[in-house]
Amino acid sequence: MSLFDTINAGGAELLGFAWPTVWAVVRILVVSVVILLCVAYLILWERKLIGWMHVRLGPNRVGPGGLLQPIADVLKLLLKEVIQPSAASRWLYLIAPVMTVVPAFAVWAVIPFQAEAVLANVNAGLLYAMAISSIGVYAVILAGWASNSKYAFLGAMRAAAQMVSYEISMGFALVLVLMTAGSLNLSEIVGSQQHGFFAGHGVNFLSWNWLPLLPAFVVYFISGIAETNRHPFDVVEGESEIVAGHMIDYSGMAFALFFLAEYINMIVISALAATLFLGGWDAPFEFLSFIPGIFWLVLKVFALLSVFIWVRATFPRYRYDQIMRLGWKVFLPVTVVWVIVVGFWMMSPLNIWVK
């Protein structure tokens, strides 16, 4: 019996009919607190890593080695006044930052941390994740419109166009995973990557989806960078053009919520990429399978997040027309062609996904 089964059985015996509700609330709170801590130290890791790439030290004054810098940043933002422009639509202006964070948290309901460790093990988990992660752009549009500022509105329109341009390519990449796994359940998708010739010989990482679906994996991850408005796709908030885009009139914690959502979405994209293409909680080699699965998932997510940061420190910002061209003229045709190729592959005698 696993730890979760033991807790569940003990709680049901202690609290009776009220236990399912209490257990659900406890799991949601635990996951939410862990995500907030991860965001805080992801920001510190980003500043440290970029500092090292620039041959600097990065934050190193608050606490030992700068470990308390995230706490100092949060306290600073909490103490700042939330200023509202006189021409803004009051309630919409205040609701928009909250609307960016809620979908970012909601996606975690279906992401499995290891076998049987998931908030909601639903059969349509992949569809839910795709749908709920697309809602955040509406908050960006709302923020740009409610601010009643030309720069904010321009940033919001850029965000809408960018989301539409890359959401389709991401969707086709996920269709490929659905075709090969035969399920929308994220736990079953991880399970489908644990079979095959290489997995049977103990080399698990060669059985993961990243190898046969490599174009889809690359398109999904780069599209994820664009979806989160990260560098080099950050024309939505391009400092040299429109200062801060849709966030230009926000301050204090309202401003911080936009960045909180951005970093949560970075972790979501990395967690989904690890789950769909990198075997989720599966160990790369069979002889390492004694290590808890959540360790491997965290390691894969950390590696992908480091790629996010490396891309920011390395590449120049794309022009707006270059971003649109990449989405429509490169990624979309590549994913459509690969869907057709994999379809014929699965119908041929060389099908490697036979269950």
Swiss-Prot record:
GO biological process: aerobic respiration
Protein known as: NADH-quinone oxidoreductase subunit H
Molecular function terms, GO-annotated: NADH dehydrogenase activity; oxidoreductase activity, acting on NAD(P)H, quinone or similar compound as acceptor; quinone binding
Record family assignment: Belongs to the complex I subunit 1 family.
Spans through the membrane: 25-45, 91-111, 126-146, 170-190, 205-225, 253-273, 290-310, 330-350
Organism of this sequence: Burkholderia cenocepacia (strain HI2424)
Known role: NDH-1 shuttles electrons from NADH, via FMN and iron-sulfur (Fe-S) centers, to quinones in the respiratory chain. The immediate electron acceptor for the enzyme in this species is believed to be ubiquinone. Couples the redox reaction to proton translocation (for every two electrons transferred, four hydrogen ions are translocated across the cytoplasmic membrane), and thus conserves the redox energy in a proton gradient. This subunit may bind ubiquinone.
Pfam families: NADHdh (PF00146)
EC number: 7.1.1.-
Reaction(s) this enzyme catalyzes, per UniProt: a quinone + NADH + 5 H(+)(in) = a quinol + NAD(+) + 4 H(+)(out)
Subcellular localization, as worded in the UniProt entry: Cell inner membrane
